[in-house]
Amino acid sequence: MELFKELTDVSQGVRRLGAAAVDLCHVALGVVDATWEYQLKPWDVTGGCVILLEAGGKLTTMDGQPYSVFSRSMLASNGPLHPQLLQYTQPKTEALLRQGFDLSEWFVPRGYNLK
């Protein structure tokens, strides 16, 4: 909640539609500049991730690590805004990890290459 408040304070507004794939498509279209979320599952985001990346958007975990559909946190942006967003999301995510919040990858099928 603290992260939500901080990002609301430095942005022109925060909007959540309830569907991560739709949020990713809105970033890809330029309707919004970014979206972020914790505790997603692969089926929540896969289609939207493809659309965002094909449109030239940037996608990482909220602590700046490479993203895969098995990641439990996601930060997506128009690209140029990404480093500024990470200044907010990275320390908050690291604090959650120190508190024992589970952001390990969801089940990755045996033999599946994340790279």
Predicted regions and their residues:
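IMPase-like, lithium-sensitive Mg2+-dependent phosphomonoesterase catalytic core
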Residues: 1-115
